């Protein structure tokens, strides 16, 4: 192998490594984790926000235990204090809504709560360090910036 080929291989390897590093950082930037759930019934685990394309998701951690209540649900609170009741944690056939897609009408998420819809009681909550902007919120924000020009 000539010196020129060795140089090309080394250079291409460095470019590939840089690309992989940048790609992994961009994926990590779209993932946010809450504090630990704290409450009367939900007090283990955390929730993670992720994004797949234009869909925002919430997933609970492996440590999370579904509270033993009649109708525990996902619930989120935005930075303005608006509360959005979302899917049940347990569904038919002993299945679980471990990951849910956030509806487009939710523009940011400050807190993730576990709520019992039957008893109308908050079972526990976890907060993000700062509110997480959803894809629909980013779209609204960019449109309002364009209108202000």
Where are the model-predicted features located?
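Beta-strand signatures of extracellular beta-sandwich domains
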Residues: 73-77
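N-terminal signal peptide c-region/cleavage motif recognized by signal peptidases
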Residues: 23-25
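Short, exposed beta-strand-loop hairpins at the edges of beta-sheets
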Residues: 102-127
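An anionic, turn-rich surface loop/hairpin at beta-sheet edges
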Residues: 80-107
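Transition segment at domain starts
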Residues: 27-53, 86, 131-148
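Bacterial N-terminal signal peptides that target proteins for export
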Residues: 2-14
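Short amphipathic, basic-aromatic surface patches that mediate peripheral association
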Residues: 58-64
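Solvent-exposed strand-loop boundary residues in beta-sheet-rich modules
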Residues: 78-82, 118, 132
